[in-house]
């Protein structure tokens, strides 16, 4: 029996604001517990929330970038539940009138393009964080309480884990390029919940939904969905019923584990937030935000391919992160050849990042240094071999490439008036190589080049040496 999967994703993005959504407390990652809180975050009696307008600006940027319709009037609602990290016993969110609806993202999987709908996106506050100590005590950190979140809820349009992975990749890229969030999953500024059901092929009615919450990497999303597909198929084929439930992904086993069975959707008794007035969004403000939107990844890709002439694959690699793309643009602006800059960034720079498990913001190589080095390669000042030594020094120590080359005497020898006599002497001293060359043995010229390189301690420009040798040998 064949089955069809239906997948929907809920993605939370931490919006990049200086203060929280309803209080003036600062927002930063890694601060000491409960040092970025105040009476509003603690839900002290009599305090009232004060809306941070910048949250709307950032949310609207994401809405516009995903072709979503921004609602002219939105309001906040109370989602009622009790948990230690939620001191008010309710969360302020948007349930009845969200920020935006009816958007979409285009993905490409296995060579086919597909449009994935965005059901809605809404603004809400984050909860605090519980930590359970080995001493039997539990601790609550309210630093995260009230941090602004944008939740993007997809339509259930994805039909396999690869489509879900492609959707997440594209959504993350779009949000990152708007600057609304730094989308760092390892810091919790991007979190993913998945919903998956399966049904026999040809059946219209959807199967029973299984939810998986707080998946902390794209790989976990893909692997957990793949496992859950197979698990649900086995349940149905054995005559059982899939339970409406929440499960978690066990990274060690690659399996999903039951957390709780649901009897139905939770009743959070939503009602309008009485302490925050409905928020009216003027079209003129939406237009102003749209005008200020930074260049999208799709626009950059077009520029890289059409204006800079680099390959589509190279453009896609550069655009995997905004930091990488910004670094590339800065290098080209500093005078680097676009194609050479793409090659060095995608091979040498990315190789260093992967090997050392760091981001491009952590390295000491600047875009200007990369541009300077590429210019020296292109004008023949240094060889590609020497360039790798210069690159290593610059990326590890931040050394200026030009100064390093001059201080170490690495300037490539390209002066024909110096190399010409050396070539003539090497040819005179190696008559057998001349004979071999005339007999069509290509290795002969390689030997002669090697002799020149040995005499110049590797500083001779190989291209110039080859040209001079060919000319000299042809004249014999």
UniProtKB/Swiss-Prot annotation:
Signal peptide: none annotated. Its EC number is 6.3.5.-. One of its GO terms (molecular function) is glutaminyl-tRNA synthase (glutamine-hydrolyzing) activity. It comes from the Bacteria. Keywords: ATP-binding, Ligase, Nucleotide-binding, Protein biosynthesis. It catalyses: L-glutamyl-tRNA(Gln) + L-glutamine + ATP + H2O = L-glutaminyl-tRNA(Gln) + L-glutamate + ADP + phosphate + H(+); L-aspartyl-tRNA(Asn) + L-glutamine + ATP + H2O = L-asparaginyl-tRNA(Asn) + L-glutamate + ADP + phosphate + 2 H(+). It is an enzyme of class 6 (ligase). One of its GO terms (biological process) is glutaminyl-tRNAGln biosynthesis via transamidation. Heterotrimer of A, B and C subunits. Belongs to the GatB/GatE family. GatB subfamily. NCBIfam families: gatB (TIGR00133), PRK05477.1-1 (NF004011), PRK05477.1-2 (NF004012), PRK05477.1-4 (NF004014). This is Aspartyl/glutamyl-tRNA(Asn/Gln) amidotransferase subunit B. It comes from Lactobacillus johnsonii (strain CNCM I-12250 / La1 / NCC 533). The gene is gatB.
